[in-house]
Amino acid sequence: MIRRSPLVAVILFVAITHVVLALDDATRIDSSEIVPSEPTRRTRVSPHYISSGGSKRSLRQQAFRPVAYLKNKLNWFLSRFFGTPTDAFTQMNSPRSSRIANIFRKIYMHTAKDDEYFSRLRSV
């Protein structure tokens, strides 16, 4: 049973990665679908014109919010599995580490390099 636990972790990691990438592709919205074709519009309450730039930004943020949430969850899960990126780098250079685990450590280090939590840890 102990020998199968890394295999289960790898299978879970691959499944979570596929779900995150599938949601990333599914939530991409073209700007022509978000913003109406006319550049400005009038509101019923006030007679002044409102540019559509703000609505485009808010709709785009709403569209990408689930993917950002899942990426943060994935980084959290990987940080519990591998530790900090510095720990993962140290384990990767160890002569006793396996090649498959090193592949996932590289993926983890690549996804965690832009994360706020890890950038705060590096600056301390």
Curated annotation (Swiss-Prot):
Keywords in alphabetical order: Host cytoplasm, Host nucleus, Secreted, Signal, Virulence
Tagged with keyword Secreted: yes
GO cellular component, as recorded: extracellular region; host cell cytoplasm; host cell nucleus
Motif RxLR per record, residues: 57-60
Cellular localisation: Secreted; Host cytoplasm; Host nucleus
Annotated signal sequence range: 1-22
Residue intervals passing through the bilayer: none
Induction details: Expression is up-regulated at later stages of infection.
Keyword Secreted: yes
Family: Belongs to the RxLR effector family.
Domain-related comment: Has a conserved RxLR motif that acts to carry the protein into the host cell cytoplasm. Lacks the 'so-called' EER motif, which is found closely behind the RxLR motif in most of RxLR effector family members, but the presence of an EER motif is not always essential for the translocation of every RxLR effector into host cells, or for inducing a hypersensitive response.
Function recorded in the entry: Effector that acts as a broad suppressor of cell death to interrupt plant immunity. Inhibits cell death induced by cell death-inducing proteins, including the PAMP elicitor INF1 from P.infestans.
Name this protein carries in UniProt: Secreted RxLR effector protein 49
Species assigned in the record: Plasmopara viticola
